[in-house]
Amino acid sequence: MSKLGALLTICLLLFPITALLMDGDQPADRPAERMDYDISSEVHRLLERRHPPCCMYGRCRRYPGCSSASCCQGG
């Protein structure tokens, strides 16, 4: 029975030490790796600001993103 108790004690002492993250493994300590997951508007295409389309419902509208009134041609 004492062998089982000793084995259980050793297992309980060793497992939490290996299961916890060490300070060096924290994402805050690795800025280069954090940049891979950056979802700022400069990187993520779904967050980009887009101009409204020039041609809506068959009419050509003037928006700051449109260069001329002929923006609907070819569409």
Curated annotation (Swiss-Prot):
Signal peptide: 1-19
MF GO annotations: acetylcholine receptor inhibitor activity; ion channel inhibitor activity; toxin activity
Major localisation: secreted
Top-level taxon of the source organism: Eukaryota
Pro-piece positions: 20-50
Residues with Glycine amide modification: G74
Gene Ontology CC annotations of this record: extracellular region; host cell postsynaptic membrane
Disulfide bond entries: C54-C66, C55-C71, C60-C72
Entry's localization field: Secreted
InterPro entries: Conotoxin
Function of the protein: Psi-conotoxins act on postsynaptic membranes, and act as non-competitive antagonist of nicotinic acetylcholine receptors (nAChR). Is more toxic than Psi-conotoxin PIIIF. In vivo, has paralytic activity when injected intraperitoneally into goldfish.
Domain remark from Swiss-Prot or TrEMBL: The cysteine framework is III (CC-C-C-CC).
Family membership noted in the UniProt record: Belongs to the conotoxin M superfamily.
Protein name (Swiss-Prot/TrEMBL): Psi-conotoxin PIIIE
Biological source species: Conus purpurascens (Purple cone)
